[in-house]
Amino acid sequence: METWQEVAVHVHRDAQEAVSHVLIETGSQGVAIADSADYIGQKDRFGELYPDVEQSDMIAITAYYPSSTNLADVIATINEQLAELASFGLQVGQVTVDSQELAEEDWADNWKKYYEPARITHDLTIVPSWTDYDASAGEKVIKLDPGMAFGTGTHPTTKMSLFALEQVLRGGETVIDVGTGSGVLSIASSLLGAKTIYAYDLDDVAVRVAQENIDLNQGTDNIHVAAGDLLKGVSQEADVIVANILADILVLLTDDAYRLVKKEGYLILSGIISEKLDMVLEAAFSAGFFLETHMVQGEWNALVFKKTDDISGVIGG
């Protein structure tokens, strides 16, 4: 019987997506994320509130490696990468790393216990792919397989991106999703009525995972996934461009975004920690955008900019 090695990394919630990516890059075959915020005030599939859930800023990200993996080398690499993330200003908290060995059948089912359907916005609910879920009238369901990396749609940066998409999409738009990760924002855009979505990611794993998640959802053949370095080489104009990535990378795409966003179109930027907010604002303003909406959850910020000559309805207009 094949065995697997489990590594649990305990970090601050703000580092969820970055650390998940690190674990996949070190060879993990999947990750599971245990976050108390996903359970407080939520009901399980039987309609019962989760009992005795204590709020914490720390989460556990569990990764699974084949038995042939040299775990000592992996853990050393993880610690190096986490230290580098902290040096970039990302809050990782007091990191601890644990490991154990699992049988094949334990690995196959162990991580699924962490995930339940989650209502993210007024219209959008994210549902694990293996769960039978009866949607209510008007509810739009995004099916995701969170067995791979890039989060499950419950991180504050993703939630705010989804809120922003609900705010700006009215139907028939062209959307560009930069750094698509799991593909959740592209799937949401399709469900919210966008006509065509182009999803780009520099990471080949993300491109594959996004396509797999898109294939789980009906009516999403209007999403086109491809490898791409931000907006370099992209000529397709869009009504909406959305990017949920680190602030240091967001500032690199604002000029290209202004070139591609149609007049009266929108640029949605998320993944911005508060200490880097001014840097992102300055880059977007310099490119020519006007700020329409600023959302905040904890230390995270999301911004909705508009490309317009009519500044009467925008912040600072």
UniProtKB/Swiss-Prot annotation:
InterPro entries: Ribosomal_L11_MeTrfase_PrmA (IPR050078), Ribosomal_PrmA_MeTrfase (IPR004498), SAM-dependent_MTases_sf (IPR029063)
CDD domains xref list: AdoMet_MTases
Gene Ontology CC: cytoplasm
Major localisation: cytoplasm
Function noted in UniProt: Methylates ribosomal protein L11.
Family: Belongs to the methyltransferase superfamily. PrmA family.
Name this protein carries in UniProt: Ribosomal protein L11 methyltransferase
PANTHER family assigned to the protein according to its UniProt record, in alphabetical order: ELECTRON TRANSFER FLAVOPROTEIN BETA SUBUNIT LYSINE METHYLTRANSFERASE (PTHR43648:SF1)
EC number(s) per entry: 2.1.1.-
Biological processes annotated in GO: methylation
Any matching Pfam family: PrmA
Catalytic activity: L-lysyl-[protein] + 3 S-adenosyl-L-methionine = N(6),N(6),N(6)-trimethyl-L-lysyl-[protein] + 3 S-adenosyl-L-homocysteine + 3 H(+)
An example Gene Ontology molecular-function term: protein-lysine N-methyltransferase activity
Coiled coil: none
Gene coding for it: prmA
Residues that hold S-adenosyl-L-methionine according to the record: T158, G179, D201, N244
